[in-house]
């Protein structure tokens, strides 16, 4: 797929998203990270590379609101297995709501 929308929950500093965004400039990549320091580090890398198709937002998964965006892929590498039950339930809820049909 050459054009897609990708959401990563628990993206840290963008180690997955940034290389994909560089490789797929017609796609959109959004990362959500709880740690303000990790999110800021990722944003700094995105800005240094001039990637207009990638963004990282500092937020708690439990507080995410539906902004109308839909995603072809949702990545939860590590986060799902390391999180408490309420976060895992929220990840499933978000995935079912935000995945493109």
What label would you give each PLM region?
Residues 35:
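Conserved SAM/SAH-binding beta-strand->alpha-helix loop
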Residues 50-61:
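Conserved SAM-binding strand-loop segment of SAM-dependent methyltransferases
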Residues 2-12:
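Conserved class I S-adenosyl-L-methionine
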Residues 42:
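Conserved SAM-binding loop
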Residues 13-26:
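Conserved SAM-binding loop of SAM-dependent methyltransferases across substrates and taxa
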Residues 89-101:
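A short glycine-rich, Lys/Arg-flanked "PGG" loop and its adjoining helix->strand segment in the class I
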Residues 65-74:
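A short acidic, Gly/Pro-enriched loop at the edge of an enzyme's catalytic core
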Residues 76-80:
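Residues lining the SAM
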